[in-house]
């Protein structure tokens, strides 16, 4: 089992799929990382040699991933809330940000229904 960016990658999966278990690396970026590192994306993680794992680590290290990315996103949201702009207010109230309707729907963002008290 390879460990990259503080994440244990599943040994039985292909490299490009396993890299996606790192927060901040999706389908496109994982394929790009494999290509630049010179690793076949369809190789199973358990079959990787130590130099290949090191090349992947070096390539993933060029991106902001995992805890740093989560922190950066949190700081950006906090900044919006401190500014008091529309998006910040929507974050503060737990409502959708991008113009979706809220009279019906938006249950994921609003949470479970609250009964109306008479």
UniProtKB/Swiss-Prot annotation:
Annotated keywords: Ribonucleoprotein, Ribosomal protein, RNA-binding, rRNA-binding, tRNA-binding
What domain of life does the UniProt record list for this protein's source?
Bacteria
Q: Report one GO cellular component.
A: small ribosomal subunit
Region Disordered, annotated ranges: 96-118
Q: Name one GO molecular function term.
A: structural constituent of ribosome
Q: Name one GO biological process term.
A: translation
Q: Which family does it belong to?
A: Belongs to the universal ribosomal protein uS13 family.
Purpose of the protein: Located at the top of the head of the 30S subunit, it contacts several helices of the 16S rRNA. In the 70S ribosome it contacts the 23S rRNA (bridge B1a) and protein L5 of the 50S subunit (bridge B1b), connecting the 2 subunits; these bridges are implicated in subunit movement. Contacts the tRNAs in the A and P-sites.
UniProt cross-references to NCBIfam families, sorted A to Z? uS13_bact
Assembly with partners or alone:
Part of the 30S ribosomal subunit. Forms a loose heterodimer with protein S19. Forms two bridges to the 50S subunit in the 70S ribosome.
Protein name in the entry: Small ribosomal subunit protein uS13
Q: Which organism is it from?
A: Stenotrophomonas maltophilia (strain K279a)
Q: What is the phylogenetic placement of the source species in the record? A: Bacteria, Pseudomonadati, Pseudomonadota, Gammaproteobacteria, Lysobacterales
């Amino acid at each position: 089992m390879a460990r990259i960016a503080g994440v244990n990658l599943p040994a039985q999966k292909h490299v490009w799929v396993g890299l996606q278990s790192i927060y901040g690396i999706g389908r496109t970026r994982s394929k790009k990382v494999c290509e630049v590192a010179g690793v076949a994306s369809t190789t199973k993680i358990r079959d990787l040699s130590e130099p290949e794992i090191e090349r992947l680590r070096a390539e993933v290290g060029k991106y902001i991933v995992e805890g740093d990315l989560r922190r950066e996103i949190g700081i950006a949201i906090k900044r919006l809330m401190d500014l008091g702009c529309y998006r910040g207010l929507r974050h503060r109230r737990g409502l959708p940000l991008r113009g979706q309707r809220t009279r019906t729907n938006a249950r994921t963002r609003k949470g479970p229904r609250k009964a109306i008290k008479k």
